Regions:
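Bacterial N-terminal signal peptides
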Residues: 10-20
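Intrinsically disordered, low-complexity regions enriched in Ser/Pro/Gly/Gln/His and often acidic
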Residues: 1-2, 17
Length: 596
């Protein structure tokens, strides 16, 4: 826990229980509880313990672990306060802890403050599934007949454990103004800090034939300042909220140095490749950089409650995010110092009763997202600079329409019918436009006093999901005849047989792991014969697939489970649960084939 959080919570606690002193000096309702304990843990695992302990609440190795809980409540007249403290020591890198404070001053001022410290284990890709055919000296390999992996890899930190320690503190206050009945002001301040290490992976030298992983320092800080108001005037409610967010990465980005370019290994003659270099840079280059950013947003919401029980809601959100950008001297430059993204979102909802047994809800949302265009200029080694213009691929318009009908069949039994239409219109033609229709059906019923059942089914029909256009499958032609041993690509008429022209520009197939069709069903039943016992059985089944050009993707999920709760007469509660998850995915992928 950082010093700032400690000081804030100490001051808040002093304000709660010492100010105003005249209030707490008199008799007041005061209660509290304290709990502490220790546990000895023996950890046994056959694989990486982080796979089942990503957000650790227990130690990663054998040892003693302690915990403590404190809860205090006090009230007098119109003043009330409560304080919760939770502490767990003995974890791997830091102590897990959380604090929460609530203070109510005559319902005119309400203060809420909380802080939390937690750990997050990061993934470590060993890269040992990547190997090369020509990483060292020796004879060449026939790539047409000996299908070995053709990518080299180096994990520079094979023994390192990557972990992020996250600290968050939130402070919020609601202030009711006696001079303006029905109006409440809201102010808030939030900080989040992430500190530790993550794995950074990059491509080395000239292409993607050499993959390298190393450690990257993380020292991020996010600050949020919020303000707003809520006004209630009879059946009319008006809300406005403002957010100002600053993000800063205080750690330096990892760097790498471009290797000297040499000719292929034996039996070819050794020599330099200076004539084929796109650029030559003698110093270290930064990669995997996280830019600083700023965000501001304004949101307004109006709600009208009608006399017949109907409800009408309208909303508008404007957000602007700026990301700091800079070129790299002697390599490239940008025509702007920051890139800006804008969001305009409009929403509406209408809810009304149809007779005594049906409720109809209609809603819609339109989002307009726009990103900056920019120009990138590469500094020339000789001759003129190379200038490239870019337009933002995130620019798009989104439409979302929903209809929901709730039907009451009998006492304790309802059926819900729903339909949703989604449309995404992207500015880049290569990314395509997506349309989706979603159909929903749900049943919720109490079959008896002790037995209840919930069933839900959803079907999604998606046209042109987001995909990587022309991402794979270069047409190959055997030009050596039956006696040949190699399959090579032939140049089209008028096309130079360079790598980019011959391979990348001639790919034909699209790749995506986004589905075109989804079926999902959920069912659960709860049996509660008494107020001291309850058990629930549940299951989820999901099947999704697509069939784009020369590519197919399928994924199936089966996730059943059961839970049981039992309360003894002595105040002891027992909870047991079992969950099973089986997920199978089949998807074609395009693997780069680089050889020497």
């Amino acid at each position: 826990m950082n010093t700032q959080s400690k000081i804030w919570l100490l001051l808040a606690a002093l304000l709660t229980f010492l100010v105003p002193a005249t209030v707490w000096a008199e008799e007041a309702d005061f209660s509290g509880s304290f709990e502490a304990g220790v546990s000895a843990l023996s950890i046994s695992d056959s694989d990486d313990v982080k796979r089942v302990n990503e957000y650790p609440t227990i130690r990663e190795d054998d040892g003693i672990q302690g915990y403590g809980k404190v809860k205090l409540e006090a009230a007098k007249g119109g003043v009330a306060a409560d304080l919760d403290l939770n502490y767990q020591g003995g974890n791997s890198r830091t102590d897990i802890q959380s604090q929460e404070l609530n203070l109510d001053l005559n319902r005119l001022i309400r203060i809420h403050s909380e802080s939390e410290t937690m750990e997050h284990w990061g993934d470590h890709d060993t890269l040992d599934y990547l190997n090369a055919t020509m990483k060292g000296s020796g004879t060449t390999t026939n790539t047409a007949t000996d299908k070995q992996p053709a990518i080299a890899s180096d994990d520079l930190t094979p023994e390192e454990d990557f972990m992020i320690i996250r600290r968050e503190m939130k402070n919020e206050a609601d202030i009711a103004l006696p001079q303006l009945p029905g109006v409440t002001l809201h102010v808030g301040y939030r900080t989040e800090e992430r500190e530790g290490t993550e794995q950074a992976i990059t491509l080395s030298k000239c292409a993607a034939c050499h993959v390298v992983g190393e450690s990257k320092q993380i020292n991020e800080k996010t600050e949020d300042l919020t303000a707003g108001l809520t006004g209630k005037f009879g059946g009319l409610t008006i809300e406005y909220d403002y957010l100002n967010r600053l993000f800063e990465e205080q750690a330096a980005a990892p760097t790498y140095r471009v290797d000297v370019a040499n000719a292929p290994d034996l039996p070819y003659p050794t020599g330099n490749f200076d004539g084929r270099l796109l650029y030559d840079y003698p110093d270290e280059l930064a990669y995997n950089e996280t830019p600083d950013s700023q965000k501001q947003s304004h949101s307004a919401k109006v709600r009208v409650d009608m006399v017949n029980g109907s409800e009408l809601v309208g909303s508008y959100v404007y957000a602007e995010a700026k990301s700091d950008k800079a070129g790299d001297p002697d390599i490239y430059s940008l025509n702007v110092n920051e890139l800006t993204s804008e969001l305009n979102a409009y929403g509406a909802k209408f809810k009304t009763r149809l007779g005594k047994s049906m409720i109809l809800t209609l809603s819609g949302k339109v989002q307009e997202i726009a990103g900056d265009d920019f120009t990138l200029t590469y500094e020339a080694v000789s001759g003129a600079n190379y200038v490239q213009n870019f337009s933002s691929e995130e620019t798009r318009d989104e439409l979302d329409l929903k209809a929901d009908l709730l039907i009451r069949l009998a006492k304790g039994q309802t059926v819900r019918l729903g339909y949703e239409y989604e449309e995404i219109d992207r500015e880049h033609n290569d990314l395509g436009d997506t349309e989706a229709s979603i159909y929903k059906l749900a049943y919720n019923g109490r079959l008896s006093k002790a037995l209840s059942v919930r069933v839900k089914y959803q079907y999604e029909d998606i046209e042109d999901p987001f995909r990587n256009h022309n991402a794979a499958n270069v047409p190959l032609t055997d030009v050596n005849g039956s006696a040949g041993t190699g399959v090579v690509i032939t140049a089209a008429s008028g096309v130079d047989l360079r790598y980019g022209d011959a391979f990348y520009d001639r790919r034909e197939d699209d790749l995506t792991n986004m589905p075109e069709e989804v079926h999902e069903a959920k069912v659960s039943t709860t049996w509660s014969p008494s107020s001291q016992f309850s058990t629930t059985l549940y299951a989820r089944v999901r099947q999704e697939s697509n069939d784009v050009i020369n590519n197919s993707y399928e994924q199936s999920v089966f996730a059943p489970g059961a839970s049981m709760w039992f309360a003894t007469t002595g105040g002891l509660n027992l909870t047991m649960a079992y969950n099973f998850n089986k997920e199978e995915t089949e998807n074609k992928m395009c693997v780069g084939w680089y050889h020497g």
